[in-house]
Amino acid sequence: MEIKPITIYTGKTVPLFYDNIDTDQIIPKVHLKRVSKSGFGPFAFDEWRYLPDGSDNPDFNPNKPKYHGASILITGDNFGCGSSREHAAWALKDYGFNIIIAGSFSDIFYMNCTKNAMLPICLNQKEREHLAQFDEITVDLPNQTVSTVSQSFHFDIDETWKNKLIHGLDDIAITLQFENLIEKYEKTF
């Protein structure tokens, strides 16, 4: 899969301040009937996003006109908990999110984000509340900062994940960096 590198990214924000949003809330299991990574966006947050008649829920923040086109989700603690389905990351990416800022993430969900070219960022509640006041924010991955016009916040990220996202590398691309060594090994053994 081709991954678009993330270095400095400016995007529109949408707040969704709930804690413990699990993978079944992100993408209900009824929609897991395909293995392709695309096509899950319309089902992201399905039970919150739509009313029983199938129309958009006007009270769901991402449905509000002011948030249309948002690519940075600002949310609560323990985002992506629950089952380890990678479909949750696929749904959020297909919906249009490139960055998710939360208080914390499930470990498996965090990894699934990075494998699908989404940057998960952990910030405290005060920092997230500040960011949510702005329509757009800028994320500088090389310097590990999230900025508004008035303030910047530092975030931590493992160097391996950071390097993969900055250079647009997936697991296959990383493996192919060692192609000569692999071929040499195969010829030797």
Swiss-Prot record:
Keywords: Amino-acid biosynthesis, Branched-chain amino acid biosynthesis, Leucine biosynthesis, Lyase. Its EC number is 4.2.1.33. One of its GO terms (cellular component) is 3-isopropylmalate dehydratase complex. GO terms for biological process: L-leucine biosynthetic process. It catalyses: (2R,3S)-3-isopropylmalate = (2S)-2-isopropylmalate. It holds the Pfam family Aconitase_C. GO terms for molecular function: 3-isopropylmalate dehydratase activity. The keyword Signal does not apply. It comes from the Bacteria. Disulfide bonds: none annotated. Pathway: Amino-acid biosynthesis; L-leucine biosynthesis; L-leucine from 3-methyl-2-oxobutanoate: step 2/4. Signal peptide: none annotated. InterPro entries: 3-IsopropMal_deHydase_ssu, Aconitase/3IPM_dehydase_swvl, AconitaseA/IPMdHydase_ssu_swvl, IPMI_Swivel, LeuD. PANTHER family: 3-ISOPROPYLMALATE DEHYDRATASE SMALL SUBUNIT, 3-ISOPROPYLMALATE DEHYDRATASE SMALL SUBUNIT 2-RELATED-RELATED. Belongs to the LeuD family. LeuD type 1 subfamily. Heterodimer of LeuC and LeuD. Catalyzes the isomerization between 2-isopropylmalate and 3-isopropylmalate, via the formation of 2-isopropylmaleate. This is 3-isopropylmalate dehydratase small subunit. The lineage of its organism: Bacteria, Bacillati, Bacillota, Bacilli, Bacillales.
